[in-house]
Every structure is written in structure tokens, then in C-alpha cells.
């Protein structure tokens, strides 16, 4: 059986532009894509922290070091410049790989510059949100799940 697992995310990035008349997609600084392990053309979920909108689209590589995060096409009706968003990529993997896979988590500042890298999807950085009170450390949760199945 294949499982759909979280593989990488860019956390709380700021939307820098929106173009309703573009053909679609989300344009993302190539440095951020690389750090999150997301490829150009890859399916991503865009979760708007500002207004709660959630959509799926594909990525287009933006200029390295630019901090660009542009919402293109019809999604520009839902997500606007200045909104905080989370870009999330998922991948299919078998159970054995899913139990050991280390996702890539990229935390950015208000200008979409990388401030922290990690693999725990529940970790927060100083000045950001807090860790959910009942969240277990990512590696520990995997160990507990493996023990339960054994």
C-alpha cells in the first residue's frame, strides 16, 4: 500500500504578488523550493493563514534570492499580496519509507528569507506561532507508531 505523506513545506511565507490573468500556478523563489525539496511543476497545497483559503496548484521556479511568492491565475481571487501562506508538498511512499522519511520544513521571515530549517512539522521558531501543546516530537511519533504496529 502507498501512503500520501507530507514531504516538505515552506512555513508562513508572505505572498509578494498576485496575477489573476496568468495561466495558473504559484511562483516561488528557487532557493525556497530547493530548501523544501519541492520541484518546479510539483503539486502543492497552498494554505492561506490570513483568511483560511486552501487550494492546490503547481510550482514555477522564481528568481533565486528574490523572495518571490506569487499567486497566479484564478487563485488570485483567494490569496492576496501580504497574506501569510504555507506551501505543502506531499508524496506517495510505502509504509517502510514513510516510517523513516524526514520531511523538509523551511521557516522564513517576513521577506521570505530562510531563518530555520528542520524536519519536524510541528516545530515553531522564535517569534512565530507556538508548538501545538499535544504534539510529540516528529521522530518520537514515528518510533511510537512503529512500536504499536510491532
Swiss-Prot record:
Cofactors (names): pyruvate
Catalysis performed (reactions): L-aspartate + H(+) = beta-alanine + CO2
Positions of the catalytic residues: 25 (schiff-base intermediate with substrate), 58 (proton donor)
Modifications the protein undergoes after translation, according to the UniProt entry: Is synthesized initially as an inactive proenzyme, which is activated by self-cleavage at a specific serine bond to produce a beta-subunit with a hydroxyl group at its C-terminus and an alpha-subunit with a pyruvoyl group at its N-terminus.
UniProt-annotated location(s): Cytoplasm
PANTHER family, per database record: ASPARTATE 1-DECARBOXYLASE
Cellular component annotations (GO), alphabetically ordered: cytosol
This protein's record includes keyword Lyase: yes
Cofactor, free-text remark: Binds 1 pyruvoyl group covalently per subunit.
EC number: 4.1.1.11
Sites where the protein binds substrate: 57, 73-75
Name of protein: Aspartate 1-decarboxylase
GO terms, molecular function: aspartate 1-decarboxylase activity
EC top class named in words: lyase
Pfam families, alphabetized: Asp_decarbox
Keywords, in A-Z order: Autocatalytic cleavage, Cytoplasm, Decarboxylase, Lyase, Pantothenate biosynthesis, Pyruvate, Schiff base, Zymogen
Amino acid at each position: 500500500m502507498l501512503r500520501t505523506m507530507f514531504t516538505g513545506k515552506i512555513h508562513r511565507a508572505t505572498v509578494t504578488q498576485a496575477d489573476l490573468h496568468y495561466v495558473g500556478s504559484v511562483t516561488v523563489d528557487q532557493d525556497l523550493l530547493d530548501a523544501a525539496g519541492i520541484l518546479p511543476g510539483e503539486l502543492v497545497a497552498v494554505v492561506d493563514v490570513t483568511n483560511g483559503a486552501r487550494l492546490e496548484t503547481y510550482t514555477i521556479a522564481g528568481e533565486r534570492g528574490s523572495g518571490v511568492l506569487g499567486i497566479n491565475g484564478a487563485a488570485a481571487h483567494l490569496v492576496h499580496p501580504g497574506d501569510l501562506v504555507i506551501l505543502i508538498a506531499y508524496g506517495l511512499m510505502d509504509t517502510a519509507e514513510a516510517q523513516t522519511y524526514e520531511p523538509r520544513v523551511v521557516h522564513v521571515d517576513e521577506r521570505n528569507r530562510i531563518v530555520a530549517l528542520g524536519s519536524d512539522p510541528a516545530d515553531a521558531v522564535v517569534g512565530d506561532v507556538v508548538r501545538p501543546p499535544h504534539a510529540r516530537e516528529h521522530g518520537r511519533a514515528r518510533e511510537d507508531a512503529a512500536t504499536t504496529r510491532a
